[in-house]
Every structure is written in C-alpha cells, then in structure tokens.
Amino acid sequence: METIRPKVNETQEFIEIAFDFSNPLDLIREAISNSFDAKATEMKISFKTISDCGEKILKITLEDNGVGMDMKGLQSFFDLGNSMSRDDEEKIGEKGHGTKVYLNCKCIEVETVKDGKKYKAVMDEPKRKLHNREIPTVEVKIEEADSKKSYTKIEVLGYNNNRRDKFTHDNVKDYILWFSKMGSIEKEFGIYKNRDVVLYLKGIDKDEYEKIEFGHVFPQESIAVSKLFDTYVVDAPKYYCKKFIKNGV
C-alpha cells in the first residue's frame, strides 16, 4: 500500500491570499483589527504620495500605541496561517491570513517596540518575488529602545499598484465606520470597553488628520413624516430615519 501525504504549494498560497482580496481597503480593516488585538487606544492612518526616481509611489502609514511585537510577534505577522490570537476569544484575528494583503506592494517596513527592545523589519519587493515564485524574506534589526513605551508603526509602499482612487479621506472614513472594529455598534448595547479608543485619519486628499471616535455614527431621527413631505416632496423617503429597539431572548 502506498501513502500520499498532501502538500502545500507555499508560494501559491501566499499569492492567493495576498492578491485575492477584492477591496484594497481591506488592508485598513486588518490594520485596525491588529491594533485592537494589541490593546491600542490610539491609532493613526495616513496616505500620501512620494517621489522615487520620478515615479509617484503610494505610501500608507499605520501606527498604534499597542503592546508592540517581538520576534515571535513579527514572525506571526509575516507568516501565513500562524496567528497568536487563535486561542484568545477576545481577539479579532484568528486565521493568520488578513495581514497577507499587505504583500501586494513594493515594500513593507515595520518598526515596533516591546519590552525595551526596538525591532525594525523590512520586506523588499514581496509582490514581485511572489510572482517569481519566491517567498519574500524579512530582514530584522534589533536594538535597545530609547523609551520603554511600546508602539507599532508600519509603512507600506507601492500598495495596489500605486492606485490611489480608493484612499480619499471620505471614502476611507466611510469604510472604517461601516466595515471595521472602529465602527462597532457595541455602545448601543451598553458595552463601553472601547469607548476611549480614537483613530486619527488623513486621506490621500487631506493635509490634516481628523479624529474619529469609537463607535458607529447613527444619524439623528428625522422629523415627522408629514413635515418631511412638506420639505422634500417626493424625496422625503430619502431623509426618513427611525430607531427601533426590540427586546427578546
């Protein structure tokens, strides 16, 4: 009897995960989830273009004041299917897939501090190497941190072929409040664990950061329907908003 042991095509799996995310903004959701898992109370996300030999490069910067990462944490961050959150019910990430969307870029730079050590990790040309059937490696430098204050800062260069149309301020803000942990409705249910978490956002078309507080923003309930029709006529239904609360088991 012969035995077949299934194998995994590592490079192909990295390619499938990194490039099969349908929405480029999914990178933002994954970054926010990681920040919550790191117990961060403050996040900063910004988009800008920089010039490299006459070429405009999209630069995404993601920062938080969470617990930071050590070598084990960095290994998990770059690995496929290796999640340090899998056995923690309070954590969001559990599959070890999400951050691989970062690999759809030219370069990833991570600077993080944990337990008095500063780690600087660089992955060059992940997209090109994966398409050449090569798993990209990460170079890590370790040094003493100037402060024991932990944090993580990630810079992603050349993401999504430098296409910038999705990263306008209003578009990113809307995505954050509808599709990420920052837009959770838990406060509506009397859960205030994350009420002090804030995010500072600067879209590709902005020069200043906007402070976004935790929790989905619901519109005010509208005035009486009859008054809406008096004001907006046939467009009145577009302006109708009513909050319903149902109790049950």
Question: How would you describe each model-predicted region?
Answer:
Residues 55-60, 152:
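Short beta-strand element(s) in the Bergerat
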Residues 67-132:
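Flexible ATP-lid and adjacent glycine-rich G1/G2 motifs of the Bergerat
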Residues 132-205:
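ATP-binding catalytic core of ATPases
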Residues 192-249:
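GHKL/Bergerat-fold ATPase module in large chromosome/replication-associated machines
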Residues 64:
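Acidic ATP/Mg2+-coordinating residue in the GHKL
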Residues 2-14, 171, 211, 215-220:
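Flexible hinge/switch segments at interdomain interfaces of large molecular machines
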